[in-house]
Regions:
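TerminUS-proximal long segments
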Residues: 2-4, 259-317
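Gly/Pro-rich turn-and-neighbor structural signature
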Residues: 5-83, 191, 195-227, 231-241
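Internal mixed beta-strand/loop scaffold within catalytic domains of large alpha/beta enzymes
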Residues: 51-128
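Glycine-rich, often proline-containing surface loops adjacent to acidic residues and nearby aromatics
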Residues: 63-64, 92-95, 124-133, 179-197, ...
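Short conserved micro-motifs at the rims of enzyme active sites and ligand-binding pockets
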Residues: 78-80, 197-198, 253-259, 277
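Compact, glycine/acidic-enriched structural inserts
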Residues: 120-165
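Hydrophobic, aromatic-enriched interface-forming segments
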Residues: 150, 154-200
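An amphipathic alpha-helical core segment
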Residues: 165, 169-187, 219-264
């Protein structure tokens, strides 16, 4: 957080997020052939939301790309737990959040969000990132995802990608399962480095790299043949997604605590999910390979860039 004289401009941030929402919805709708719905939902104190939801498409079974601009008299607990000195203060926030659940199990789920808070009169910070959750991972896809993530961070220092990558691994982790949600990406919070202008530039760079990170992967996997076995595994892995969003995610808790429209808060949940008691993958199967080799933090750029396979998890060795 900062109280820098480099004055924050919530209007500029809000405008960028709204433009990014339109760009991403248009690109994904072009791939699927079905448009996103559009709503304008007024909020208290002059705030508003624009949820755009995709449902029942050919490529995507469900998805949402949502913009919100909130104004409140007291910062919700989920937004101040890392900075308790801000609890109870008035705030203004804008955010874009997206999640796409594909039908094809070989197409990874992707999630991204960017947010900006002003608390009181001078304290502000950015947050967000993007992450990838494959059921049947391909090394070239994981490598491309992290190379693009690194490219997004490169103008802001060589240390930025490793830091945001490590924070992503730590955040998108299910401790009750002892596994990561997917293969990671970028995550940052309370970001003010370099003042508002540079922090906003980094936020825009990450936002501008979302489609270049995901569309090539989508294009490679969209026509991959799949059957009942792969679909069953997709529904099983979606359960992990639901567990994280409902039990762990700070964004979900913030949405519930801030009084946001419940349909928008829970729009990220997958449309169909299965849980199986004590399910175990077949030894030697692709399903076991995901569990044993991918659901742990790894240095993907060094590992896959050198042509090496991902390491087996320590708990299964």
């Amino acid at each position: 957080m900062t109280t820098s004289t480099d004055q924050p401009d919530v209007t500029a941030v809000s405008s960028y997020f709204e433009t990014l929402q339109a760009t991403i919805c248009d690109a994904l709708a072009e791939v699927d052939g079905q448009p996103f719905s559009t709503e304008e939902v007024p909020g208290p104190n002059g705030g508003h939301a624009r949820p755009r939801v995709h449902s029942g498409g050919v490529v995507f079974e469900k998805g949402a790309v949502q913009f919100t601009h909130s104004v409140g008299s007291a910062l919700p607990a989920a937004a101040s737990e890392r900075n308790p000195e801000l609890a109870g203060q008035g705030f203004e926030a804008c955010a874009i959040s997206m999640i796409m659940h594909p039908r094809n199990p070989y197409v990874p789920v992707f999630h991204a969000n960017l947010r900006f808070f002003i608390v009181g009169s001078t304290t502000w910070y950015f947050g967000g990132g993007f992450d990838l959750t494959p059921c049947y991972p391909f090394d070239e896809d994981v490598l491309h995802w992290h190379q693009t993530a690194r490219d997004a961070c490169a103008p802001f220092g060589e240390d930025v990608y490793p830091r945001l990558k490590a924070d992503c691994d730590a955040y998108f982790y299910l401790p009750h399962r002892e596994e990561t949600r997917g293969v990671g990406g970028l995550f940052f919070d309370d970001w003010t480095e370099g003042g508002f202008t540079q922090s906003f530039a980094m936020c825009r760079s990450i936002g501008d790299h979302i489609l270049p990170a995901y569309l090539p992967i989508l294009g490679r996997r969209i026509a991959h043949v799949w059957g009942e076995r792969e679909e069953a595994f997709l529904l099983y892995r979606r359960g992990r997604y639901a567990e994280f969003n409902l039990a762990i995610d700070r964004g979900t808790r913030y949405g519930l605590q801030s009084g946001r429209r419940i349909e928008s808060v829970l729009a990220s949940l997958p449309p169909r999910v299965n849980w199986h008691y004590n399910w175990q993958p077949e030894p030697g199967s692709p399903e076991e390979y995901l569990t044993e080799h991918y659901l742990k933090p790894q240095d993907w750029l060094s590992l896959l860039g050198a042509g090496k396979p991902p390491a087996q998890s320590k708990t299964s060795e």
